[in-house]
UniProtKB/Swiss-Prot annotation:
Its EC number is 1.3.1.98. Its cofactor is FAD. Residues 34-221 form the FAD-binding PCMH-type domain. Keywords: Cell cycle, Cell division, Cell shape, Cell wall biogenesis/degradation, Cytoplasm, FAD, Flavoprotein, NADP, Oxidoreductase, Peptidoglycan synthesis. It holds the Pfam family FAD_binding_4. This is UDP-N-acetylenolpyruvoylglucosamine reductase. It is found in: Cytoplasm. Pathway: Cell wall biogenesis; peptidoglycan biosynthesis. Belongs to the MurB family. The keyword Kinase does not apply. The active site is at R179, S228, E298.
Length: 309
C-alpha cells in the first residue's frame, strides 16, 4: 500500500480526525543524530481522544511506531513503514502540580519536568535534568541519571492501546527494572503521575545545576548524538569496556565514537543511520572479543535498512 492510499484508507475509516497526517515525511530532522529515512505516514494527534479514534479505526495489520523527542533513537535509512506517531507539546505537553503530586503529559521534555518540580519546591526529580528525552521515553525505558530513576517517583501511567482503549498502569504494573519497563509494547503513553517530596527550592536548583555541569563536562552534548549508546552490563561500565577495547575515537563513515565519552556515538557530518548502527555493532564486537562482556543497545533502533542502490 502506498502512503497516499494508506492515508485515504485512514480518512475513510476515521473521517473526523483532527490531527495532522503527512505522507513520506522525513524523520531525520526529528532525531538528534539527524539521520534516517521517512515515515510512510506521520500522524500527530490533536489530543488523546483523537489518538484513541485514530488507533481504533486503523487496520490492525498496519504497523505503528511511536517517535518521541528523537534523542535516544536511530531511524534506519529505509525509513518506517506504516504509521509513525508523534505526540505534540500542545496536546501532550502540560505539567500540573497539586501538592506533592505532579501530572505530566508524555511529550514534556524530562528537563522541563525537573524544572517544574523544582519551582514547586518538590525534591526527588532533579535527576531528570540530566536526561535528554521526553517523559514518554523515560516511562518506556525507566530512564535515569545521576543516581535517580523514573521508578523512584512514578505513581501511575495513562495510555492508549492499539484498539484505541484507555489503559492505566500502577507503578507495580509497569514492571520497572534497569532501563526497562514491562508495559505492553502496543500502548502509547499519554500521561503520567509522579510524586515528589517537600524540599528547599534553592537546594533543588543547586542540585540541578550540579547535574547540568557534570553532564556538560563529561558528555558531548553539543554534538549530534543520541545519548548513552549501551546499557551498563552487570559488573561493568560500558564506557570503560569500550575504552579498554580501544574504541575511543573509532570512525565508520561519518560516525565516530566520541573522544569525550566513549559510550556516545556522534554524527561528524554526513553520517548515515547505517554508519552509526554499524559502528555500534563494531564496538560491541570489539568489547566482546576483548573482555567477554556483551553490550546491549540502550538506543532504540527502528525502521528498515535502505534498499541496495
Amino acid at each position: 500500500m502506498t502512503a497516499h492510499s494508506l492515508i485515504d484508507a485512514i480518512r475513510a475509516a476515521a473521517p473526523d480526525l483532527r490531527g495532522r497526517l503527512l505522507e513520506n515525511q522525513s524523520l531525520a530532522d526529528l532525531t538528534w543524530f539527524r539521520v534516517g529515512g521517512p515515515a510512510q505516514v506521520l500522524f500527530s494527534p490533536a489530543d488523546e481522544a483523537d489518538l484513541s479514534a485514530f488507533l481504533a479505526a486503523l487496520d490492525p495489520a498496519v504497523p505503528v511506531t511511536v517517535i518521541g523527542l528523537g534523542s535516544n533513537l536511530i531511524v534506519r535509512d529505509g525509513g518506517i513503514p506504516g504509521v509513525a506517531i508523534r505526540l505534540g507539546g500542545k496536546a501532550f505537553g502540560s505539567v500540573e502540580i497539586d501538592g506533592e503530586t505532579i501530572r505530566s503529559g508524555t511529550a514534556v521534555p524530562d528537563m522541563r519536568l525537573a524544572k517544574a518540580a523544582a519551582e514547586a519546591s518538590l525534591d526527588g526529580l532533579a535527576f531528570f535534568r540530566g536526561i535528554p528525552g521526553s517523559v514518554g521515553g523515560a516511562l518506556r525505558m525507566n530512564a535515569g541519571a545521576h543516581g535517580g530513576e523514573t521508578t523512584d517517583v512514578l505513581v501511575e501511567v495513562r495510555g492508549i492501546d492499539r484498539k484505541g482503549e484507555v489503559r492505566r498502569f500502577t507503578h507495580a504494573e509497569m514492571g520497572f527494572r534497569y532501563r526497562h519497563s514491562s508495559a505492553p509494547d502496543d500502548v502509547i503513553f499519554t500521561g503520567a503521575t509522579f510524586r515528589g517530596r517537600p524540599g528547599n527550592r534553592e537546594a533543588i536548583e543547586a542540585e540541578m545545576e550540579r547535574v547540568t555541569a557534570a553532564r556538560e563536562a563529561a558528555q558531548p552534548i553539543r554534538e549530534r548524538t543520541g545519548g548513552s549508546t549501551f546499557k551498563n552490563p552487570e559488573g561493568g561500565k560500558a564506557w570503560q569496556l569500550i575504552d579498554a577495547a580501544g574504541c575511543r575515537g573509532l570512525i565508520r563513515g561519518g560516525a565516530q565514537v566520541s573522544e569525550m565519552h566513549c559510550n556516545f556515538l556522534i554524527n561528524r557530518g554526513g553520517a548515515t543511520a547505517a554508519d552509526i548502527e554499524g559502528l555500534g555493532e563494531e564496538v560491541r564486537r570489539r568489547v566482546r572479543d576483548h573482555s567477554g562482556f556483551e553490550l546491549h543497545w540502550e538506543i532504540k533502533r527502528i525502521g528498515v535498512e535502505a534498499s541496495p542502490a
